[in-house]
Each structure stands twice: as C-alpha cells, then as structure tokens.
Swiss-Prot record:
Organism: Bartonella quintana (strain Toulouse)
Similarity field: Belongs to the universal ribosomal protein uS13 family.
Gene Ontology terms: biological process: translation
Protein name: Small ribosomal subunit protein uS13
UniProt entry tagged with the keyword rRNA processing: no
Length: 122
C-alpha cells in the first residue's frame, strides 16, 4: 500500500481513482497530477515504482493543499465568518443552511433530528 500525503491509498485501483482517496484531490486534480508526472491512465498503484510514487508526492506537495492543511484552512475561513458576525457566519453559528436553502420543512441534515414540541399534533 502506497502512502501519499499521510493517506494509505489502495493498491489494486488505478492511480487516478486511488489519488481521490486523499482529501482535497478530486477527479480533475487526480488527472492533472498523473499527466504532470507522466503516468499512463490505466496504470494501477501496485505497478508504480518507488520513484513514481515519490514524483506524485512531490507534485502534490508542490502545488496542492490537501488533508490537514486544507481542513485547517476551511475551519479558519468558517471561524472568520463567525467572528465577523456576517449573515453566513450567523448561519454557521446556528447550524443552519448557509446557502439560501429552505428550512421550514427540510434541512434535517444540518439541523439534526426533529425535536418534538408539546401540544403540536395534527
């Protein structure tokens, strides 16, 4: 199992798919990285040499924010919004949807399980 950016990536999958196991690397960035390093599309992780794994590591370290750094940056951005007291910050603080979705009937993922209200039965 190859270890890239602190993540054990699966050995039996193709490189483009396996790279997507790293937080912050999606399909587009995975393709970009493999193209930059010069790895064919169909190559599997178990077929990679140590030099190729090292090249992938260097390409990721060089140009992409992944894993802990990315999570930290997102958390800092959300905290900044909350400290500013802007509308988006207030929505984050109250654990409500931030991007204008309706909350009267939906938004259960963000709000959590429904709370029972005494005397409210139809």
């Amino acid at each position: 199992m190859a270890r890239i950016a602190g993540v054990n990536i699966p050995t039996n999958k193709r490189v483009v798919i396996a790279l997507q196991y790293i937080h912050g690397i999606g399909p587009r960035f995975a393709q970009e990285i493999t193209k930059k390093v010069g790895i064919p599309v169909g190559r599997r992780v178990c077929e990679l040499s140590d030099a190729e794994v090292l090249q992938i590591r260097e390409a990721i370290d060089q140009g992409y924010k992944v894993e802990g750094d990315l999570r930290r940056e997102v958390a800092v951005n959300v905290k900044r919004l909350m400290d500013l007291g802007c509308y988006r910050g207030l929505r984050h603080r109250r654990s409500l949807p931030v991007r204008g979705q309706r909350t009267h009937t939906n938004a259960r993922t963000r709000k959590g399980p429904a709370k029972a209200i005494a005397g409210k039965k139809k």
